[in-house]
Amino acid sequence: MARDKTRTTKKKERKNIASGVAHVNSTFNNTKILISDVQGNAISWSSAGTMGFKGSRKSTPYAAQLAAEDAGRKAQDHGVKTLEVEVQGPGSGRESALRALAAVGFNITSIRDVTPIAHNGCRPPKRRRV
């Protein structure tokens, strides 16, 4: 007597947004790219992990490039043409993600580094002994 479960999914409507903000969050382990409108509502996102990279390959510049291209293409489907870029974090995928967004065909108007700087805040992790 099990019923077939039918799911009703909301169709993704195509938003016509001319300009947006690309938030590139690059850590030592991963790179995440979120493209939002000017108010901060998310349009598209991607990360190195969602592109199929695992482990230490997520932190490579190539993984960040593929993630940025994926998020950029999704945003272009919604009509985004110009981007402001906010880069955050110390990772190696910052520059390659920025170049990939430009290569997709966006007109990049500004690039800002919004990495938080601690003023003698938390104690940093211990030095690695290799």
UniProtKB/Swiss-Prot annotation:
Function: Located on the platform of the 30S subunit, it bridges several disparate RNA helices of the 16S rRNA. Forms part of the Shine-Dalgarno cleft in the 70S ribosome.
Keyword annotations of the record: Ribonucleoprotein, Ribosomal protein, RNA-binding, rRNA-binding
InterPro entries membership: Ribosomal_uS11, Ribosomal_uS11_bac-type, Ribosomal_uS11_CS, Ribosomal_uS11_sf
GO CC field: ribonucleoprotein complex; ribosome
PROSITE patterns (alphabetical): RIBOSOMAL_S11
Protein family membership: Belongs to the universal ribosomal protein uS11 family.
Protein name as it appears in the record: Small ribosomal subunit protein uS11
S-S pairs: none
Organism expressing this protein natively: Ruegeria pomeroyi (strain ATCC 700808 / DSM 15171 / DSS-3) (Silicibacter pomeroyi)
One MF term in the entry's GO annotations: rRNA binding
